[in-house]
Amino acid sequence: MAIDAFLGKWCLISSEGFDEYMKELGVGMAMRKMGSMAKPDVYIIKDGDTITVKTESTFKTSQFSFKLGEKFEENTLDGRKTQTLVSLKDDGSLIQEQEWDGKKTIITRKLVDGQLVVECDMNGIKCVRVYQKA
């Protein structure tokens, strides 16, 4: 499966374990409350071999751009500066690995029955967020 299958606008329809995952990341309580309440739209855009992921909510908008397989510095929504690598696996999943201060989290995006399923994992604390194509 090519990256093109991920392109478009995606709207959050369900979220499980997000508060616990944000806590494991080190996100403060006020920002966790806002993050848990937000129903973000995610835009995945491709321009040549550069891919941009833009997350928009009523609270905050952020975006990052990358080329598959090339490490880059990402400024996350919660204020972390990470070294990030995004790769497309043979099974069609998009794997985003963030490293900072000796810590690591892995965000896996995959398409399941036409929905974008985002699985986040840090130290075994997992969350699953499901998006419907707009």
Swiss-Prot record:
Molecular functions per Gene Ontology: lipid binding
GO cellular component, one term: nucleus
Amino acids binding N-eicosanoyl ethanolamine: 109, 131
Reaction catalysed by this enzyme: hexadecanoate(out) = hexadecanoate(in); (9Z,12Z)-octadecadienoate(out) = (9Z,12Z)-octadecadienoate(in); (9Z)-octadecenoate(out) = (9Z)-octadecenoate(in)
InterPro entries, alphabetized: Calycin, Fatty_acid-bd, ILBP, Lipocln_cytosolic_FA-bd_dom
Residue sites binding (9Z,12Z)-octadecadienoate per the record: 129-131
The keyword Transport is assigned to this record: yes
Residue ranges the record marks as coiled coil: none
GO BP terms: lipid transport
Primary location: cytoplasm
Subcellular location: Cytoplasm; Nucleus; Synapse; Postsynaptic density
UniProt binding sites for hexadecanoate: 109, 129-131
PROSITE patterns reported in the protein's UniProt record: FABP
Pfam family, one: Lipocalin
Assembly: Monomer.
Known function: Intracellular carrier for long-chain fatty acids and related active lipids, such as endocannabinoids, that regulate the metabolism and actions of the ligands they bind. In addition to the cytosolic transport, selectively delivers specific fatty acids from the cytosol to the nucleus, wherein they activate nuclear receptors. Delivers retinoic acid to the nuclear receptor peroxisome proliferator-activated receptor delta; which promotes proliferation and survival. May also serve as a synaptic carrier of endocannabinoid at central synapses and thus controls retrograde endocannabinoid signaling.
Family according to the record: Belongs to the calycin superfamily. Fatty-acid binding protein (FABP) family.
Notes on the domains: Forms a beta-barrel structure that accommodates the hydrophobic ligand in its interior.
Official protein name in the record: Fatty acid-binding protein 5
Species assigned in the record: Pygoscelis papua
